[in-house]
UniProtKB/Swiss-Prot annotation:
Name of the gene encoding the protein in the UniProt record: pheT
Residues binding Mg(2+): D466, D472, E475, E476
Keyword match Nuclease: no
Keyword entries, A-Z: Aminoacyl-tRNA synthetase, ATP-binding, Cytoplasm, Ligase, Magnesium, Metal-binding, Nucleotide-binding, Protein biosynthesis, RNA-binding, tRNA-binding
Protein family (similarity comment): Belongs to the phenylalanyl-tRNA synthetase beta subunit family. Type 1 subfamily.
Localization terms from the record: Cytoplasm
FDX-ACB domain ranges (all copies): 726-819
Record-given protein name: Phenylalanine--tRNA ligase beta subunit
Keyword Protein biosynthesis: yes
Species whose genome carries this gene: Porphyromonas gingivalis (strain ATCC BAA-308 / W83)
EC number per UniProt: 6.1.1.20
């Protein structure tokens, strides 16, 4: 949320700088994202002055340029070459002197001394669009004859500067979603620090001569709409807002529309209460009904989009039941205020947060009004906001005030909380004087209605929807008192619990994340929601096993993901289009599946399952072309190495798992990682060409998806040990094997480890050959076997016995032949 510095000072006059205010707000829990200086005209018209054109002659080398001399109040006139068709001697103009920076959209350019068609030019005579004071670019600005020569253009155009403070409001602090709300917290902090701070709310005085004009209001459900107020104003003039109002809205990033709409927006950001103005001519029967409508009713909102309503959407309707506005969310196209409007009905209401949130999400509308209503507003605050807006409308747009309607069926009682000074000190951890506690509570508008034996009975304002318990009040006291005022004691009390399984999993996630980042990977975070269309036609992840959303935000986000793959492909595609061609990514996330067969009336949730996974993507170049190394693309073998390193890091060593070819339609070719007992730990391989083409990716993508729950379960069976460096030498033996092309190295490694579990340390493939001089359907593998005994040096007899056993096994199981 954006806060204007000057606007804020209207409610809390103080001498703090914008940055000091931002720092203070952050210290009391209203964290600020930054402070930005803004001006009503970009650049503040610095370097521009009012000039008087003394002479204007045609350029000798051009048929459209003019050579002018312009008095800008300096020691001598400036010679300026100008291309505007309307420039003439005697005019008062706006001149950009040398060194001035002008802005056009996102572009900017500096005025320099130049030579145009052989004639020197020492500035520029400007048009409206060039300096940002209008939209005309047909010629130079011609000012009135009494415009003072040499006056800075910023002074002539009344350029104002301000500071925009970005405040990050947490969802529970709806009371701080306005300038007055922020000022209230700031005042409390200043008072706590001994700085005089008087919070001022503008007085509202409405005329007593009210015309006989009133709208009848009927609320169908007081729970859906606890309070609805409105009044009529006739004979208004809709037009442009005054400069001060436009400046206030522009300072916080809002676009002025017209004086009526601007006033409702102004009061919203001033006091936090949303308002809506209806064109009275479109309220049929002079009656407003707050109700729901029939399922499927079409409704065109202010943005011109037709939306289908449901029977749960709360609407503002006319006497015929025709919807005019989505309550608390968005107005209708045909009932809003236009330049032709002369009479209005001004609404200030309170709507049920749950209903507003549900409707706003379903319709895909996130407005300033819904943002506040969703968090819960105080029905008592509608009245002041309505009167304030009516007062401003009468002042700015004229008109005559009609009657007010107020439907408030069940006025809320004050929320009472009991709190002792003893508990305040106990929870905070230090003694705070009762007078300080009372002062802080008073500054937060929390009234002490009773105090007896050190126990206070507090009346909490209804707008503080987040303060419902005594500990919430203590948090408020602590927030204003200052967390940095509470020093650490000489001892720390804490409970040290045993490491839970959840703790263990998070610990290993951190360890593996650090390992991957150290290897050059970047962590990504994708949405758990995905497009159901991704799963159409897949056998490994069929569409019918997707968890569908009942009310999706869009068709691109209509189901929960079954695999991490597609989110990563979206990220890869996005970055590849921006010329980031070599990408190493990983992601932690949950995946979800629906098993219809497991669903019963007694256990409806048994059909749903979720599990944690680790996704790893590799794409692009492993080594870029340089003087030292030729270019080398990534490969599935690089991904395989990463997978093995992750498994090793969590304690699952090479011999504890097997790699087998997988039939998975996500991949062009893939391997499954399984335990010796056949439990699946993950899958990796080359992503299917058809899939990557759907994401407009034109280079191979290698993807691994590890089942983290299964990995953690398996790793718990092994104990990580720190070992001494081997004291005895390692022996290497090589075999050149002739094999069928279908045989994988993983099969060779697995069989070899089965032959010798104790002494065989590593199995490595160092050469592959396929081609001439080999029988059809055959290939040659050159494999190294590394043997070591940690207790003594191996002798030739032991080595040969092991190697003979390995050779025999490979011959019998794989049909291998020694070359």
């Amino acid at each position: 949320m954006n806060i204007s510095y000057k606007w804020l000072l209207e409610y809390l006059p103080c001498t703090l700088s914008p940055q000091e205010i931002a720092d203070t707000l952050t210290s009391i829990g209203l964290e600020t994202g930054g402070v930005e200086e803004i001006e009503t005209i970009r650049g503040g018209l610095r370097g521009l002055v009012i000039g008087h054109v003394l002479t204007c002659e045609e350029h000798p080398n051009s048929d459209h340029l003019h050579i002018t001399t312009v008095d800008v109040g300096a020691d001598a006139p400036l010679q300026i070459v100008c291309g505007a068709p309307n420039v003439a001697a005697g005019q008062k103009v706006v001149v950009a002197t040398v060194g001035t920076t002008l802005y056009h959209g996102e572009e900017e350019f500096a005025i320099k001394k130049s030579k145009i068609r052989g004639v020197e030019s020492f500035g520029m005579i400007c048009s409206e669009v060039e300096i940002g004071v209008g939209s005309s670019n047909d010629g130079t600005i011609v000012l009135p004859s009494d415009a003072p020569v040499g006056m800075p253009a910023a002074e002539y155009y009344h350029v104002e500067s301000d500071y925009c403070i970005e405040v990050d409001i947490t969802p529970n602090r709806v009371d701080a979603t306005s300038h007055y709300g922020v000022a209230r917290d700031l005042a409390a902090s200043l008072k706590r620090n001994g700085v005089p701070a008087e919070l001022k709310l503008p007085e509202v005085n409405l005329p007593t001569d009210i015309i006989d004009s009133r709208i009848e209001v009927k609320v169908a459900d007081a729970t859906a709409c606890p309070r609805y107020q409105g009044l009529v104003i006739r004979d208004i003039t809709v037009g442009e807002s005054p400069e001060w109002l436009r400046n206030r809205l522009q300072a916080i990033g809002l676009r002025p529309i017209n004086n009526i709409v601007d006033i409702t927006n102004y009061v919203l950001h001033e006091f936090g209460q949303p308002l809506h103005a209806f064109d009275l001519a479109f309220i049929k029967g002079d009656r407003v009904h707050v109700q729901t409508v029939a399922e499927g009713t079409p409704f065109v909102t202010l943005d011109g989009v037709e939306r289908k309503l449901t029977a749960e959407d709360l609407m503002i309707c006319d006497s015929n039941g025709d919807p005019m506005c989505v309550a608390g969310v968005f107005g209708g196209l045909h009932s809003g205020v236009t330049e032709k409007t002369t009479d209005i009905f001004l609404e200030s209401a309170n709507f049920n947060p749950t209903m507003v949130r549900r409707t706003a999400r379903r319709l895909g509308l996130n407005t300033d009004s819904s943002f506040r209503f969703e968090r819960g507003l105080d029905p008592e605050r509608t009245d002041w906001a309505l009167r304030r807006a009516a007062s401003l409308i009468l002042e700015i747009a004229g008109g005559h005030l009609g009657g007010m309607t107020d439907v408030y069926s069940n006025p809320l009682k004050p929320h009472l909380i009991s709190l002792s000074f003893e508990k305040v000190n106990s929870v905070i951890g230090r003694t705070i004087e009762p007078e300080m506690v009372r002062s802080i509570l008073n500054s937060l508008e929390i009234r002490i209605s009773k105090e007896e034996d050190g126990v206070m009975t507090l009346e909490v304002p209804r707008y503080r929807t987040d303060v419902t318990r005594d500990v919430d009040v203590i948090e408020e006291i602590m927030r204003i008192y200052g967390y940095n005022q509470v020093e650490l004691t000489g001892y720390i009390r804490a409970s040290l619990g045993h490491e839970t399984e959840t703790d263990r999993r998070y610990k290993w996630q951190t360890v593996v994340s650090e390992q991957l980042v150290g290897a050059g990977f970047n962590e990504i975070l994708n949405n758990s929601l995905t497009a159901g269309s991704y799963y159409e036609g897949l056998k490994s992840h069929p569409r019918e096993m997707a968890v569908e959303l009942m009310n999706p935000l869009s068709q691109e986000l209509n189901c929960m993901r079954q695999t991490l793959l597609f989110g990563g492909l979206e990220t890869l595609s996005h970055n590849l289009r921006r010329k980031h061609l070599s990408l190493y990514l990983f992601e932690w996330g949950k995946c979800y599946r629906f098993h219809a067969a497991k669903r019963t009336d007694e256990t409806p949730l048994a059909a749903y399952a979720e599990d944690d996974r680790l996704g790893i993507w590799i794409c692009g170049q492993r080594v870029h072309n340089s003087w030292a190394h030729p270019e080398e693309p990534t490969s599935v073998f690089e991904l395989k190495a990463v997978v093995e390193q992750v498994l090793c890091r969590v304690g699952i060593e090479t011999g504890a798992y097997t790699l087998k070819t997988a039939d998975n339609d996500l991949y062009a070719s893939a391997m499954e990682v399984k335990t010796r007992s056949g439990k699946l730990l993950g899958t990796f391989g080359t992503v299917s060409t058809e899939l990557i083409k759907r994401f407009e990716i034109e280079q191979p993508v290698y993807f691994a998806e590890l089942l983290w729950d299964a990995l953690m379960s398996e790793s718990a069976r092994y104990k990580l040990e720190a070992r001494d460096l081997p004291r005895f030498p390692e022996v290497k033996r090589d075999l050149a094997l002739l094999l069928d092309k279908a045989v994988s190295f993983a099969e060779i490694e697995s069989l070899a480890r089965g032959c010798e579990k104790k002494l065989l340390r590593r199995v490595e493939l160092f050469d592959v050959y396929e081609g001439k001089n080999l029988p059809a359907g055959k290939k040659s593998y050159a494999v190294s076997f590394f043997l070591r005994n940690d207790e003594k040096t191996l002798n030739d007899k032991q080595i040969e016995a092991i190697m003979a056993k390995i050779r025999t096994t490979l011959e019998q199981k794989l049909g291998a032949q020694l070359r």
